[in-house]
């Protein structure tokens, strides 16, 4: 039996039309903020990535394979940030800040489930070169504008700063290597409180320390309330993080941006603010996320370059939008008009009409199977053509076309065809 691997999908025309529409809107928002596109290979050398993403990603989630001709090892693109870091290191002449967007497929060897696939599309916008909160505020605003443009209502963007947790861990809990703890906390939404406690125990944390960690990340309240509590801690990381976050909240000034101490994000390269976007329903995981990674580019160039970015998860955006009724699959074809040849001898006249319509920008199809008039019409309805145009002996003789849609029928001269077709499409 013919099939495709688990976690991979085919997309029929209605789904691809929706995806293209979503991508077009996201790309429009990226351009509105002054981001420019780049493209990078789907493959990277394994040596380029190894040791930089974290144990779970590298040991479990990446597709890694050898090239039997060169004996090199490659990895499929796990996400779009590493290719950007490698690109910037290879192009030091790039003026800063470098504002780039990148839309492309990525691959992860995860267990497929709702909202989680092994091949999926990411849309990233990053600002390279600015260490300031203005840059973080801008990528967060891109995130919020994207959600608003698709009419998502019950969404929130959770924001935290890794430096804040690191400083608190150092001063209050005596923890100097927080990264294993971050990876455990990052699983909170997947495995729950008890699961995180179990992960922390496996890391060797004693019961009282686990309790204090869970109490810390469970702190709730406005940013100002929590900030006032933590400003009493004498730690430079805490102070820098709180000042940075305060500016972001001041610039973005949106009630959907909320402070959440439990948010850490799992990748090791984050160095400052991190954020994730989710909807209350359906519970499908984060629809977008990002953060600051000021040391990643330096791993390739030998010199740290500040950077921050956002990644929009198109698959989950669409899955959530379909479930909420924000999106639908009603548009089944790009075809504006399908031309039916009433008789075989009228086909060349149909071809002439198709040339006129295509030159004016209308998506036009006509019969290529030498089928009967009724079979042509049935096919046009099946593919979802918006308007059917009939051409027969009388139309060819009088230089006319008969347009037909669900609500309208009209015979028009060729000179009137374009305006009449626009009228039909406006009500179809």
Curated annotation (Swiss-Prot):
GO biological process, one term: histidyl-tRNA aminoacylation
Gene that encodes the chain: hisS
Main location: cytoplasm
A GO CC term attached to the entry: cytosol
Keywords, alphabetical: Aminoacyl-tRNA synthetase, ATP-binding, Cytoplasm, Ligase, Nucleotide-binding, Protein biosynthesis
Protein name: Histidine--tRNA ligase
Entry's EC annotation: 6.1.1.21
Database matches in NCBIfam families: hisS (TIGR00442)
PANTHER family, sorted: HISTIDINE--TRNA LIGASE (PTHR11476:SF7), HISTIDYL-TRNA SYNTHETASE (PTHR11476)
Signal peptide: none
Catalytic activity: tRNA(His) + L-histidine + ATP = L-histidyl-tRNA(His) + AMP + diphosphate + H(+)
Annotated InterPro entries: aa-tRNA-synth_II, aa-tRNA-synth_II/BPL/LPL, Anticodon-bd, Anticodon-bd_dom_sf, His-tRNA-ligase, HisRS-like_core, HisRS/HisZ
Protein family (similarity comment): Belongs to the class-II aminoacyl-tRNA synthetase family.
Coiled coil keyword on record: no
Organism annotation: Korarchaeum cryptofilum (strain OPF8)
Keyword Cell division attached: no
Subcellular location: Cytoplasm
GO molecular function list: ATP binding; histidine-tRNA ligase activity; RNA binding
Pfam families: HGTP_anticodon, tRNA-synt_His
